[in-house]
Amino acid sequence: DACFMGALEVGKEGNINAHRGPGAFAGIGGFANITAKTPTVVFCLSFNAKGLEVTQKKGVVTIEKEGSVPKFVNKVKSVSFSAKRAISNGQKVLYVTERCVFRLTPKGLKLIEVYPGIDIQKDILSQLLFEVEI
């Protein structure tokens, strides 16, 4: 079984904030229950927010304009999903963006896929606020 969930922020350890946005606080609902008990959790989110413009032609992704608000941060504002708990529970966790895919490991995030047209240094690594395993 798998679940597909959104996320506001991803922390360097793999923790997720899915309920506390800038200047607002929303209830978490069933998010914690679903993500804690599902063997495979896939978080789907844009790499950056606010102004991001992406095109895709013939399987090639192009970042036309970068977003100004990072979604991959050193520490999330609030923990909706615990990466440490997911690792101890043996869950498979993926973070899917418009440009790449990361997998949760005991060391943190590992970059496992980069889409055609994406420059790994310019479009991914230089946009991160922390280092990831490659």
In which residue ranges do the predicted regions lie?
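Conserved phosphate- and dinucleotide-binding cores of soluble alpha/beta proteins
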Residues: 1-134
